Structures are given as structure tokens and as C-alpha cells.
């Protein structure tokens, strides 16, 4: 069992009350966001199934599909697409043209522009430069099993889709690609154009 708080310091505060393992959280993101929305203050306005803090900025032509929480001071750039249950903590930036699917982003993290983050848990103060991708599915493999390395041991994840678990303060360079099941500790650095494939195909 992975201890998510060793990667994301605020994990217990934000998601610790839910019994699911970190691997299962994205698959039930819609339900979790709906439950958390019941506890929101009157400082949030509801638009469809999206709950947006009054201090957040949502630019024109943003698509919000499914249950979404956009926290205080967040910025969502034009033509961004959020779907499938998304939680944005305080001060998160989603730049123009980004897609975020079934993911949790902690305080002050940023996707610069034209990023994809699928079925992922992204810690506090993480920065993803333009075009970097958190892939959530092995389209190119006949074996779709997702594996991760936890404390030096290869673990088979109990889900068919999972992107990345990104520790606080991680920096991800432009056009980098993180393969499904990537786990990065706090303060990691991924170089521009780098492919992270922690568990190669068998």
C-alpha cells in the first residue's frame, strides 16, 4: 500500500477521508468531487455540475464536463477542457488549450498550455511546461496492464487507466511524456522532451 502523503503533503487533508487507494481515486473522481461539493461554502457558484470559487477566473470557450471544483484564485485559460471529475485546489493554473481528465491538482500547481493530464494526482507546486503529457493508457501495447515502481518493487495497478502520481514541487519540461503508472517523488525534475517509462514493456 502506497503512502500518498510521502509524495503530496496535503493529501491527507484533501483526499485522506476517502477509503480508495490513490490508484482508484481517478476512477471515482466524479463521485469524490460531488461529495466534496456538498461541503463548499457560499463563496462558490454552481454552473451545471461545476462549482467555481468567486475569486477564480475562467476565460471564454472553456468546457467543463462532469463534476468539477475550481478553487480560490484558480485560472482556467481559453479553450481548456476539464472532464470526468476534476478537483483544482487553491491557485491552480490550467493554461489555454489544456485537457484535464479525472484528476486532482493540489495548491499552486500549473499546466502551462496545451498539456494533457489524464487520471492523475498532481501535488502542490508542480509545474508542467508547454506540451507535456501525463498519459493514462497504453494504446500502443497489446498488454494494457499498468505497472508502477513503489519502493523499488514493481506493482501491478488494479485499474485499466492511471496517469501519474506527481510529488510536490516537481518540474516537468516542455513536451515531456510520462507513461501510465509514473510515480515521481517530491522535487523531481523531468527534462524537456524526456520520455519517462519506469516499467518497460515485458
What is the predicted function of each stretch?
Residues 1-49, 54-55, 182, 186-187, ...:
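Terminal amphipathic alpha-helical/low-complexity segments used for targeting or macromolecular assembly
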Residues 28-29, 82, 111, 178:
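Short amphipathic alpha-helical segments with coiled-coil-like heptad repeat character
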Residues 51, 69, 87, 165, ...:
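ABC ATPase A-loop
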Residues 54, 58-97:
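Glycine-rich active-site/cofactor-binding loop and its immediate structural neighborhood
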Residues 102-202:
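Glycine-rich hexapeptide-repeat left-handed beta-helix
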